[in-house]
C-alpha cells in the first residue's frame, strides 16, 4: 500500500486541505493518506515551530513514527510544506518514493523577502504583529493567496474555525517565516 503524506505551508494545518484530502483519498482508494501538522500549527499549535526546515523534517518523521506510519512515503506538499518535503527527500531519500510540490520557493535560492510579493509585506506584517480577528486574518490570507473570484464563504468559515480552535502564535508564524 502506498502512503501519501500531505504537508501544508506557513501557519496552515491539516484541516486547511479541506475537501482536497478526502478527494485525494477517494482518487487513491488503496493508499493511506495522512495530513500532517507541522509543530506550531493545527493539533501541534502549542509547540514551538522549529527554526529550520531540517527541524521540521525531524518533527514530521518523529510524528509519523509516533503514529506508527512507516516509510516509504509519497509527499504532496504546498509552500513551506514543499520546502520540508524537498529537504526530507534530500536527507532521507530511502524514505521517499516521490514528491508533488505546489507553490514552493526555496530558502537557499530566494530569501523570505523574495518569496512574498512586496505589495503584500504590510498586510502580512500587520497580521503577525497586530493580529486582528480570526475572520479578518483568513479573509486577508484568501485575498493574498487566491485568484478565485470573490470570497468562498464556506472555505473561509472553515479556516476561521480552525484558527479559532488552534491559533498559531505570532512567534510561531515568525519562526516559520524566517
Each model region followed by its residue ranges:
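Conserved HGGG/HGGXW glycine-rich cap/lid loop of the alpha/beta-hydrolase fold
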Residues: 1-46
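Active-site micro-motifs of SAM-dependent methyltransferase domains
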Residues: 12, 40, 82, 106-107
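Active-site signature of alpha/beta-hydrolase-fold catalytic machinery across serine-
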Residues: 19, 87-91
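Flexible "cap/lid" loop of the alpha/beta hydrolase fold
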Residues: 90, 96-129
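Conserved alpha/beta-hydrolase catalytic His-Asp/Glu region
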Residues: 112, 131-178
Amino acid at each position: 500500500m502506498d502512503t501519501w503524506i500531505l504537508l501544508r505551508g506557513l501557519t496552515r494545518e491539516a484541516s486547511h486541505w479541506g475537501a482536497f484530502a478526502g478527494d485525494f483519498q477517494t482518487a487513491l482508494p488503496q493508499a493511506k493518506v495522512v495530513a500532517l501538522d507541522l509543530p506550531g500549527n493545527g493539533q501541534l499549535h502549542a509547540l514551538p515551530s522549529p527554526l529550520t526546515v531540517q527541524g521540521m523534517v525531524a518533527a514530521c518523521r518523529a510524528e509519523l513514527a509516533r503514529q506508527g506510519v512507516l516509510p516509504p512515503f509519497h509527499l504532496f506538499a504546498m509552500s513551506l510544506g514543499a520546502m520540508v518535503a524537498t529537504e526530507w527527500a534530500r536527507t532521507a531519500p530511502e524514505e521517499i518514493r516521490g514528491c508533488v510540490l505546489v507553490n514552493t520557493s526555496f530558502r537557499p535560492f530566494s530569501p523570505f523577502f523574495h518569496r512574498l510579493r512586496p505589495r503584500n509585506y504590510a498586510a502580512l506584517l500587520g497580521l503577525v504583529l497586530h493580529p486582528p480577528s480570526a475572520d479578518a486574518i483568513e479573509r486577508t490570507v484568501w485575498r493574498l493567496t487566491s485568484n478565485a473570484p470573490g470570497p468562498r464563504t464556506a472555505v473561509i468559515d472553515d479556516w476561521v474555525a480552525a484558527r479559532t480552535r488552534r491559533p498559531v502564535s505570532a512567534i510561531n508564524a515568525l519562526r516559520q517565516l524566517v
